[in-house]
Amino acid sequence: GVGKTEVAKQLADTLGIELLRFDMSEYMEKHAISRLIGAPPGYVGFDQGGMLTDKVDQHPFCVLLLDEIEKAHPDVFNILLQVMDHGKLTDHNGRTVDFRNVILIMTSNAGASEQAKEAIGFGRTKREGEDKAAIEKIFNPEFRNRLDAVISFDNLPMETILQVVDKFILQLEAQLMDRNVTIELTKSAGEWIANKGYDNKMGARPLSRVIQEHIKKPLAEDLLFGKLAKGGIVKVTTKNGKLELEIKSHEKIKISSKRPPLLPAN
């Protein structure tokens, strides 16, 4: 929950190319490799192409995201060797697929559980180097030697968490824009959501659950039958240590293209 997958999404969006995401927990068995490059002759599914080779053939310029790579079968790593070395992969029909214009990103939580444990020794507040040790244990040297870089993600600071809260509120406001509903988030409310929903061990994922519980659910009834049925402004504030929604109903709200996506509250 520190933004590994989100980085790949934003990279593809910035470059304006397709994002191909594969959840590698679906490829834990040895026979699952045939789903990536296709089944050999005589086996069921031979007439169907491999998921990986077909998608890259359709989108030669793309960001290829292999999520949770440590959960895949070790034989999958062997397939990726020629992709990282020569930029090509041969499917079950002998067709060579070009990977030279593909940005390959692999995410992993290897070493995260060891990193979360308390540090041992004087003057140490957290463990260091556990992630590199876990990567060396899971992946063989020939695989690691073909990687351009190994980037370790640290815990998110509070400044970043506040930006993540704004992002979730922006997404909610975009969903409600066709209903003429605008959301104003005060600074105190953003800090309340950040403190309530962020955990060092769990990352930023609990934030969405806090927003679901304290903002989306209370708004649902007002959107259907209440004050927001014909649009309005929702001001999210805090009162007595709790989140409070101040709803102002309007018959018509003109939304201009120049309006900032997140209105600052007074």
Q: What does each model-found stretch correspond to?
A:
Residues 1-266:
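AAA+ P-loop NTPase nucleotide-binding core of proteostasis motors
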